[in-house]
Amino acid sequence: MNILILGGGGREHALAWAIKQNPKCDRLIVAPGNAGIAAIAECAALNPEDGAEVVAFCEENAVDFVVVGPEAPLAAGVADALRGAGILCFGPSAEAARLESSKSFTKEVCDAAGAPTAGWARFSDLDAAKAHVRAQGAPIVVTADGLAAGKGVIVAMTLDEALAALDEIFGGTIDQSFRPSVD
């Protein structure tokens, strides 16, 4: 069986190591991989967030099964593209991946289901967000809505930290497409 793992981090290294142990694995490719992964698997220069590119690569390399490691390709719909092309894939659809890729969507789902979750508010205006933070006080959690490579959640112990976090999110240090929610 020819297997492709999408990603290049520690999670994908662990997956590659484990999959390589299976005698059914004839060829293991990791894209893009990294130097550590290259010691145990073939690495390929491939954009893991481009569904059409991944599908074409799988067809050209007779890939039987794909494991999507990182959240970004899932949010980009790569698993949907693979399934649409009839390629077996381990990873949720883009719609299901929204639970990971959008904090506000997850909060909305929790609220609709009656699942306990911290109080929250979503803002698209910096002044309104700052007014809310001032009214709530600290400590408070400020989150960017979306994938932010681990930099989207700020636990602000002081009001100044919370206001600085909002400036960072709205000011573009964190991707502009993210809008904060405040827990």
Task: Show where each model-derived region lies.
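ATP-binding N-terminal substructure of ATP-dependent carboxylate-amine bond-forming enzymes
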Residues: M1-A94
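Short beta-strand-to-turn element immediately C-terminal to the catalytic PLP-Schiff-base lysine
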Residues: G7, F123, I154-T158
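A conserved helix-loop-beta module that forms one wall/lid of the active-site cleft
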Residues: P92-G152
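Generic secondary-structure signature for well-ordered alpha-helical cores
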Residues: Q21-K24, E59, G84-I87, D111-A115, ...
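Acidic/polar helix N-cap motif
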Residues: N47-D50, S102, D125-L126, T158
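Short, hinge-like loop/turn segments at secondary-structure boundaries
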Residues: A44-P48, R83-G86, K107-V109, G137, ...
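Conserved ATP-binding module of the ATP-grasp superfamily
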Residues: F65, P116-A118, A135, P139-V141, ...
